[in-house]
Regions:
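ABC family nucleotide-binding domain
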Residues: 1-142
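C-terminal boundary and immediately downstream tail of ABC-type ATPase nucleotide-binding domains
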Residues: 139, 143-165
Length: 165
C-alpha cells in the first residue's frame, strides 16, 4: 500500500466510498465485506463519524487518515509512506503520526517511511537510512544512526535539523 504527501482521494466519493472502491474493483470483494472492512479501518484512524463526508469537507489531517485507511483496505503486507505529514498544518501532524504509531504497535505492519520527522523516525524505526542526493549515505539502527553517525554529511544534517527543533 502507498500513501503520499498529496492524499489523492477521489473528490466525488465519500470517505467510505474511497475506501471500498479498490477492494471491490481490484480484489473482487463483495460490497458488504468491503464496507465492513472500510468501517473498521475508518474507526482505526478515528474517522467513523466522517464516513459520509467528501474530501472537500475534511481537514488535511483527516484526508491523510482516509488515505491511510484506503491503502490498508487492500490488506498490504508492506506500506510505503512518502512524506505523509509534509503537506499538513503543523497542528494536525500529530493525528497522522498517532495512526502510524498504532499501526506499528498493534498491527505488526512493515512500513517504509520517507520523512523529515526525525524524532518520530528515531522513536518508531527498527532501521533508518539517511539519503542524500538520491543515495544512501548511512544506515543502521536508530540508536546508532542518531547517536553516533559515522558519515560527515549525516552528522551535518542531523546537527542542522535536531538543533532547529
Amino acid at each position: 500500500g502507498m500513501v503520499f504527501q498529496q492524499f489523492n482521494l477521489f473528490p466525488h466519493m465519500t470517505a467510505l466510498q474511497n475506501c471500498i472502491e479498490a477492494p471491490i474493483e481490484v480484489l473482487g470483494m463483495k460490497k458488504e465485506e468491503a464496507e465492513e472492512r472500510a468501517l473498521e479501518l475508518l474507526e482505526l484512524v478515528g474517522l467513523t463519524d466522517k464516513k459520509d463526508q467528501h474530501p472537500s469537507r475534511l481537514s488535511g489531517g483527516q484526508q491523510q487518515r482516509v488515505a491511510i485507511a484506503r491503502a490498508l483496505a487492500m490488506r498490504p503486507k508492506v506500506m510505503l509512506l512518502d512524506e505523509i505529514t509534509s503537506a499538513l498544518d503543523p497542528e494536525v501532524v500529530g493525528e497522522v503520526l498517532n495512526v502510524i504509531r498504532s499501526l506499528n504497535k498493534e498491527h505488526n505492519l512493515t512500513m517504509i517511511m520517507v520523512t523529515h520527522q526525525m524524532g518520530f523516525a528515531r522513536e518508531i524505526s527498527d532501521r533508518v537510512c539517511f539519503f542524500n542526493e538520491g543515495k544512501i549515505f548511512e544506515q543502521g539502527p536508530p540508536e546508532k544512526l542518531f547517536g553516533d553517525p559515522q558519515n560527515d554529511r549525516t552528522k551535518q544534517f542531523l546537527h542542522a535539523v535536531l538543533d532547529a527543533n
